[in-house]
């Protein structure tokens, strides 16, 4: 079979009626992990319910309903295959926790597909001041999704249908606003499609003979093509950060009879392997890793993206918990954050945020209240330029630099050093009121920590 294809994660964004579900459903349906039997079952149900037109959104509705009812779905349903990649759709907005998921990084998206509806009046609604198109694109950029594809959908419902003028108008408009946010339009494929009828999705449409194809210019290499599928194949595969020091935020800590304490989490950067001496922050507990397992098989080492359980000696379940971060004691070990500075974008807060505001922050797997100790500056969210020093307050739509102080021990990192540990969501009133990216962290010196016997024993063995 040769080498396995590279795995790519994408997130599909856009206004609620842009046709995200139909477009995504179409890809999964045509290239994906849904077997014929399931599709036939869906089709039959769709017809019985009078949704006889059975288009692809139905696939997605079914999957979503099952996911929300907590039925574990075969994750293959969210995957599809292209000539070059295995692509997983990690989430599509509309899911209430979409923003939180994107930030806490259940998975980091390698590319965002922005779906815009080209129908008369529809595009304008999505892009207007309060439309979601801008907000989603801004979010993707803020959270470090560096690549973007724009799918100009519903080309079959332009006036006249499949209008080149409308496609050009929308391409120009979207180019303008993604440029302001920080994407380079020259590196973004714009593809005119119909997610419903399949035009330019997998095959070139005969309805748009005027479309000569998309072309992008990038330092990693130029690319061109005609379909959305080819645009997905032009994604630049991510460099997984194995060469960075280890950071592994814990999702859970189990006590397993006969084995002992088993922390579980996803390697974000670096590698973890048996025999390594690791430090858990913010608790500052140091111990030796006895074994590393994934899917009940022991591994010689685990790399970024792997969800692993690992066994540690002489550490009780009381010592470490969800939100703790495991790191290599010898390579820039993780430490507790005393205070940190972050750039935040206030998204939907009904009032004003001023010094002293103490909401809950969701950062990697940690969930801890932090105090907005001081609003340092207000910045223009489009240009990033400072507009005011020490503002009295920040309100919805504002961006600013703030100093935060955790109310309980917390380990975070700057976004430039360890991206997955440097993004957070601010939660209040059961919603995401702001998102942030950490600029700098003042760490505690971490002098008083617990070092287990096995760590002391393991230490001299190392060179």
Curated annotation (Swiss-Prot):
Top-level taxon in the UniProt lineage: Eukaryota
Span list, region G5: 194-196
CDD domains, alphabetized: EF1_alpha, EF1_alpha_II, EF1_alpha_III
Region described as G3: spans on this chain: 91-94
Localization, UniProt: Cytoplasm
Sequence segments annotated as region (G4): 153-156
Polar residues bias: start-end ranges: 446-455
Keywords on record: Cytoplasm, Elongation factor, GTP-binding, Nucleotide-binding, Phosphoprotein, Protein biosynthesis
UniProt cross-references to InterPro entries, sorted A to Z: EFTu-like_2, G_TR_CS, GTP-eEF1A_C, P-loop_NTPase, T_Tr_GTP-bd_dom, TRAFAC_GTPase_members, Transl_B-barrel_sf, Transl_elong_EF1A/Init_IF2_C
One of the GO BP terms on file: translational elongation
Primary site of residence: cytoplasm
Family to which the UniProt record says this protein belongs: Belongs to the TRAFAC class translation factor GTPase superfamily. Classic translation factor GTPase family. EF-Tu/EF-1A subfamily.
Name of this protein: Elongation factor 1-alpha
Species: Caenorhabditis elegans
Top-level taxonomy: Eukaryota, Metazoa, Ecdysozoa, Nematoda, Chromadorea
Gene: eef-1A.1
């Amino acid at each position: 079979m040769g080498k396995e294809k590279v795995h790519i994660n994408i997130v599909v964004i856009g206004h609620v009626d842009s046709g995200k579900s139909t477009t995504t459903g179409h890809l999964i349906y045509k290239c994906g992990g849904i077997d014929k039997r399931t599709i036939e079952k869906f089709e039959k149900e769709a017809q019985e319910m009078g949704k006889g037109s059975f288009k692809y959104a139905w696939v997605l509705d079914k999957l979503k309903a099952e996911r929300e009812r907590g039925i574990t779905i075969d994750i293959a349903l969210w995957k599809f295959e292209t000539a070059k990649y295995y692509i997983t759709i990690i989430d599509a907005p509309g899911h209430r926790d979409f923003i939180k998921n994107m930030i806490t990084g259940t998975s980091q998206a390698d590319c965002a597909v922005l779906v815009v509806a080209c129908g008369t009046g529809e595009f304008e609604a999505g892009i207007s001041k309060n439309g979601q198109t801008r907000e989603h694109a801004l979010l993707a950029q803020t959270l470090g999704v560096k690549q973007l594809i724009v799918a100009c959908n519903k080309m079959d419902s332009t006036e006249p249908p499949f209008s080149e003028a409308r496609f050009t108008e929308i391409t120009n408009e979207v180019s303008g606003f993604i440029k302001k946010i920080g994407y380079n339009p020259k590196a973004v494929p714009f593809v005119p499609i119909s997610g419903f009828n399949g035009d330019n999705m997998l095959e070139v449409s005969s309805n748009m003979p005027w479309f000569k194809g998309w072309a992008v210019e990038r330092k990693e290499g130029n690319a061109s093509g005609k379909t959305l599928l080819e645009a997905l194949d032009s994604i630049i595969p991510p460099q997984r950060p194995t060469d960075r020091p280890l950071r592994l935020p814990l999702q859970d800590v189990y006590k397993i009879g006969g084995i002992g304490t088993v922390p579980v989490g996803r390697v974000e950067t670096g590698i973890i392997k048996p025999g390594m001496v690791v430090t858990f922050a913010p608790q500052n507990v140091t111990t030796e890793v006895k074994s590393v397992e994934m899917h009940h098989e022991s591994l010689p080492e685990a790399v970024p993206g792997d969800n692993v359980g690992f066994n540690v000696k002489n550490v009780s379940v009381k010592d470490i918990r969800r939100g703790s971060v495991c790191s290599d004691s010898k390579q820039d070990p993780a430490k507790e954050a005393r205070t940190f500075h972050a750039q935040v974008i206030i998204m939907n807060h009904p009032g004003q945020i001023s010094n002293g505001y103490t909401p809950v922050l969701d950062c990697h797997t940690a969930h801890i209240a932090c105090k907005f100790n001081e609003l340092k500056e207000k910045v223009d969210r489009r240009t990033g330029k400072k507009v005011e020093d020490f503002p009295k307050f920040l309100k919805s739509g504002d961006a600013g630099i703030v100093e935060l102080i955790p109310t309980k021990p917390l380990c975070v990192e700057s976004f430039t050093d360890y991206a997955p540990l440097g993004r957070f969501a601010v939660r209040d009133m059961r919603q995401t009121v702001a998102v942030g990216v950490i600029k700098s962290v003042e760490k505690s010196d971490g002098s008083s920590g617990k070092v287990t016997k096995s760590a002391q024993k393991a230490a001299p063995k190392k060179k």
